[in-house]
């Protein structure tokens, strides 16, 4: 038992605050699933948020995906050359981009760009009492603001992930074609030969989980922002950091599950 400024804590202020945050986050997720499957369904707002997320991220994902494809191909070539296996380069890139790089790069970009935007927007509405005004007006702010944005990130990020994988393979082909005479048909055949249905399914699962994580974490931090503009900035920063941490944690867990299925 610890006491700070006359207030008693079970362990300490920081530890109690951590467990309280975990519990509140759990309640927030449970409330999301309850609200998501009850009417009204704001389909128009979900579509608007999907377009906004896509337009905000498309140019950056295009540039980053292309660069990742080029750089990863350049870095992989010397290692394969030492084993006389340069012909396996397209296959390596296809597997690496589809299994890991596409979903991971997309989610990290969206965590910084989309997640911060959602958290800042909801946080600003919270501290300026716009959310309270919606409740007074008999509008469910959780359903209209949170559910729509989480659904939008869950839908949009898988689409952006496959687009990023495509652009990454374009970047890889650009590098391969500059180094050796390889036709597009041969590159595509080699790149997709070793990609299984499990790889595509795992990539889709990762993107869905990452999209949901970014949406729910950013909405949670913004929805409960306090202490004015300073609190909004703090909530935005926490949303990005926590989203990225959870994405890497989920990456490890999903990879372990997929590998268990692959070799079962």
Predicted regions and their residues:
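Active-site cofactor/substrate anionic-group-binding motifs, chiefly glycine-
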Residues: 53-105, 109
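Selective transmembrane-helix segments that form parts of the transport pathway or gating/packing helices
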Residues: 54, 58, 62, 101, ...
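Hydrophobic alpha-helical transmembrane segments that constitute the membrane-spanning cores
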Residues: 64-67, 147-176, 217, 250, ...
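Membrane-interfacial helix-loop-helix connectors in multipass membrane proteins
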Residues: 75-98, 165-208, 216-236, 257-264
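Hydrophobic alpha-helical transmembrane segments of multi-pass membrane transport proteins
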Residues: 89-132, 217
């Amino acid at each position: 038992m610890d006491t700070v400024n006359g207030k008693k804590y079970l362990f300490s202020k920081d530890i109690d605050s951590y467990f309280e945050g975990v519990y509140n986050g759990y309640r927030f997720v449970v409330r999301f699933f309850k609200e998501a499957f009850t009417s009204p369904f704001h389909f128009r707002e979900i579509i608007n948020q999907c377009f906004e997320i896509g337009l905000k991220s498309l140019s950056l994902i295009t540039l980053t995906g292309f660069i990742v494809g080029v750089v990863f191909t350049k870095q992989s070539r010397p290692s394969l050359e030492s084993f006389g296996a340069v012909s396996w380069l397209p296959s390596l890139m296809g597997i690496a981009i589809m299994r890991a790089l596409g979903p991971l790069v997309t989610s990290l970009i969206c965590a910084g760009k989309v997640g911060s935007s959602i958290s800042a927007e909801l946080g600003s509405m919270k501290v300026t009492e716009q959310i309270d005004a919606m409740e007074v007006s008999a509008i469910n702010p959780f359903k209209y603001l949170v559910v729509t944005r989480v659904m939008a990130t869950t839908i949009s990020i898988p689409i952006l992930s496959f687009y990023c994988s495509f652009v990454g393979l374009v970047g890889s082909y650009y590098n391969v074609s500059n180094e050796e005479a390889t036709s597009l048909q041969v590159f595509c055949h080699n790149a997709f030969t070793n990609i299984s249905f499990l790889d595509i399914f795992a990539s889709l699962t990762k993107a869905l989980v990452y999209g949901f994580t970014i949406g729910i974490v950013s909405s949670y931090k913004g929805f409960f922002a306090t202490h004015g503009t300073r609190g909004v900035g703090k909530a935005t920063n926490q949303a990005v950091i926590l989203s990225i941490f959870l994405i890497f944690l989920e990456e490890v867990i999903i990879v372990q599950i997929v590998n268990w299925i692959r070799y079962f």
